[in-house]
């Protein structure tokens, strides 16, 4: 057998990888009738809120399990271990990754966390997980914003809680010295509007204090394999609807590299990436 020919193990692994999104879609579709029965008219009267409740119900079940991935945990824990000072987490969901902050909070390295989570259906559990690691919302140690990462959502939300001087959607004036020591996102940038990613990265940079870090663990577009690209494109017709506006063609990695605004930026694939994975995960550490 030629050394360049795929082995049966490789073919099996690739088939499993290609079908893994279908398993997640199945979970999501199981929660669709449950959400319809719970809110029988909402799909017609408020489709956006219905989608949020649908995904919220799914993620309360699926999020904690996915947060325990043995392959991903070392990368994610390593990023949270770098967090310090005042932290902004973009898209914390249920707060399932909050456990990685326990030591930093106890040691005083992390003083306050702001969680920008656009899905209000997840806020109750998010606040509960914050209390569990010693970030008491009642003491101002944890602040939850009903906001996404895009400037038009995030900046006004920060203004409403008194953390940003202007309600303008631009993160320019008034943010020269920054607000946060650390901005972190874990598997959430895929749900942001991908066409706004350059503006999102620019806003993140503006909100960081000098020397602050933007830390991320995200799945992004796989541009290296034609079959995977076609499969991701086909899935893309239903994937965002069923998976909380998640996109398989994420581009945060490209956006930070192309921005040129960070003093240093290290973005690399995880060691598990085989070149053909549908979910291509990258780890990023960018310093202002």
Can you say where each PLM-predicted feature lies in the sequence?
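C-terminal alpha-helical "lid/dimerization" subdomain adjacent to the S-adenosyl-L-methionine
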Residues: 55, 66, 217-280
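Short conserved loop adjoining the S-adenosyl-L-methionine
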Residues: 151-177
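A conserved beta-strand element that flanks and buttresses the S-adenosyl-L-methionine
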Residues: 184
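C-terminal lobe and adjacent flexible extensions of AdoMet/dcAdoMet transferase-like proteins
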Residues: 281-288
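Short glycine-dipeptide loop
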Residues: 208-214
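Class I SAM-dependent methyltransferase SAM/SAH-binding core
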Residues: 88-160
């Amino acid at each position: 057998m030629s050394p360049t020919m795929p082995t049966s193990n490789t073919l099996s692994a690739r088939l499993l990888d290609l079908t893994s999104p279908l398993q997640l879609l199945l979970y999501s579709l199981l929660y669709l009738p449950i959400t319809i029965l719970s809110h029988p008219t909402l799909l017609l009267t408020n489709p956006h809120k219905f989608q949020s409740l649908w995904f919220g119900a799914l993620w309360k079940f699926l999020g904690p399990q996915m947060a325990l991935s043995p392959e991903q945990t070392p990368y994610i824990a390593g990023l949270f271990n770098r967090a310090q000072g005042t932290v902004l987490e973009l898209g914390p969901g249920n707060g399932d990754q909050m456990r990685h902050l326990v030591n930093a909070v106890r040691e005083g390295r992390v003083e306050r966390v702001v969680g920008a989570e656009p899905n209000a259906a997840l806020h109750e559990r998010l606040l509960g997980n914050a209390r569990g690691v010693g970030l008491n919302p009642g003491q101002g140690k944890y602040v939850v914003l009903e906001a996404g990462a895009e400037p038009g959502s995030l900046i006004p939300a920060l203004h409403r809680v008194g953390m940003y001087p202007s309600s303008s959607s631009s993160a320019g004036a008034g943010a020269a010295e920054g607000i946060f020591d650390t901005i972190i996102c874990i598997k959430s940038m895929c749900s942001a509007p991908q066409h706004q990613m350059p503006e999102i990265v620019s806003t993140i940079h503006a909100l960081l204090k000098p020397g602050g870090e933007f830390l991320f663990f995200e799945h992004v577009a796989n541009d290296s394999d034609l079959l995977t690209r076609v499969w991701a494109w086909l899935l893309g017709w239903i994937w965002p609807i069923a998976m909380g506006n998640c996109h398989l063609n994420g581009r945060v990695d490209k956006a930070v590299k192309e921005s040129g605004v960070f003093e240093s930026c290290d973005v690399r694939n995880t060691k598990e990436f085989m070149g053909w994975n549908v979910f291509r995960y990258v780890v990023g550490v960018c310093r202002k």
